[in-house]
Amino acid sequence: RKVLLMTKMTTEEAFVKVLQMHGIEHAFGIIGSAFMPISDIFPDAGITFWDVAHETNGGLIADGYTRATGKMSMVVAQNGPGITGLVTPIKTAYWNHTPLLVVTPQAANKTMGQGGFQEVEQMNLFKDMVCYQEEVRDPTRVAEVLNRVISKAFRGSAPAQINIPRDMWTQVVDI
């Protein structure tokens, strides 16, 4: 019989462990309040975050970096209006068959659908531009969902989206 040992860590740590497992070392975009908790641990994890002047630039740079190096990168934007700036680069990456991790922070689960601060229907926005998309609904599944999204991007040779409500961060989970 196999015994599975669980380790407690924060959802941010679990997210970064999955990025490391897949060799993602570069992220591009703008980090807003909905993604802020994770940015502090990128440097120690060997992940370089390249802050850009506009989300569109981040998406285009991520696409170019991935195509030039053959290494998947990540693009992230602030929820709502910031996410809309990723439309052109993500569709471009889709047409270029670029495997790209698209991270879209979102309003909190409890306020979604109520017209909260900078709320946009982010899943609908990208549904025709990604090979796969999934939203995290349970903090204990952040690593599982992220792993699946990255794997689908590699297999589909196209961008894949993980939508993460802001209340998924700063949770302690068993991994």
Regions inferred by a protein language model and the residue ranges of each:
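N-terminal alpha/beta PP-like core and its mobile active-site loop of ThDP/TPP-dependent enzymes
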Residues: 6-175
